[in-house]
């Protein structure tokens, strides 16, 4: 079985992960963890959309098992796969 490694963007300062916040009815927000399939996609996303914060962010690799436990621990609604970091094009998965 092949192991698909995923890449996340994390803050060096407080350890929080980069998420997409989606508003729900009633004013609440849900968070989706941004997941990249390649490390260079994550770096492109940072450079394109948050270049001024690049020195405060790092790329972290995670296995599918780590991703599952991380999502449970932080209470994310799902994850969002970034398929094109420049536009960005994102697929939300609950």
Describe the role of every protein-language-model region:
Residues 1-94:
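Conserved NAD+-utilizing ADP-ribose enzyme module
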């Amino acid at each position: 079985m092949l192991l698909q490694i995923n890449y996340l963007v994390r803050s060096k300062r407080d350890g929080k992960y980069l998420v997409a916040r989606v508003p729900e009815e009633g004013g609440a927000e849900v968070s989706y963890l941004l997941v990249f399939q390649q490390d260079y996609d994550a770096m492109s996303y940072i450079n394109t959309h948050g270049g001024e914060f690049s020195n405060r962010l790092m790329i972290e690799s995670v296995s599918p098992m780590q991703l599952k436990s991380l999502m449970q621990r932080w209470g994310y609604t799902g994850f969002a796969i970034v398929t094109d970091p420049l536009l960005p094009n994102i697929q939300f998965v609950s």
